[in-house]
Amino acid sequence: MQTRYGRRALTIWPLLLLAIAAEVAATSLLPQTNGFRKLKPTVAVACLYTVAFALLAQILKFTDIGIAYALWAGLGTASVAVIGVLFRNERFSWKHAIGLALVVTGVVTLNLQAGQ
């Protein structure tokens, strides 16, 4: 990942992965809120999204928003889709597979471009 401070890239990756994990966990918990009618899952979702955005804000001190957000959104989207299939019995077709492959390809391409 391209950074404004060289060596700090090593500290950005763990923060980015934590931000993605918090966002994925929050998104995965959303159905349990029952439209924000259940207090505990709603509070958990709000806290996890707060953590995700706070970490993203810290990451943006050291890297470009276009790269960081694309990686966050792409990897988060792919992760939520996989979690949906594995744990929520959601459908998965060849169209889903192609879409996820395109997302992953986009993330890899952005990463390669950022390294130049």
UniProtKB/Swiss-Prot annotation:
Keywords: Cell membrane, Membrane, Plasmid, Transmembrane, Transmembrane helix, Transport. GO terms for molecular function: transmembrane transporter activity. Induction: Is transcribed only in the presence of nicotine under the control of the transcriptional activator PmfR. Forms part of an operon with nepB, folD, mabO and purU. Disulfide bonds: none annotated. The chain crosses the membrane at residues 10-30, 42-62, 67-87, 92-112. Its main location: membrane. It is a multi-pass membrane protein. One of its GO terms (cellular component) is plasma membrane. The keyword Transmembrane helix applies. Belongs to the drug/metabolite transporter (DMT) superfamily. Small multidrug resistance (SMR) (TC 2.A.7.1) family. NepA/NepB subfamily. Component of an efflux pump responsible for the transport of nicotine breakdown products, in particular methylamine, out of the cell. This pump apparently serves as a metabolic valve for nicotine catabolites and may protect the bacteria from the potentially toxic side effects of these compounds. This is Nicotine metabolites export pump subunit NepA. It comes from Paenarthrobacter nicotinovorans.
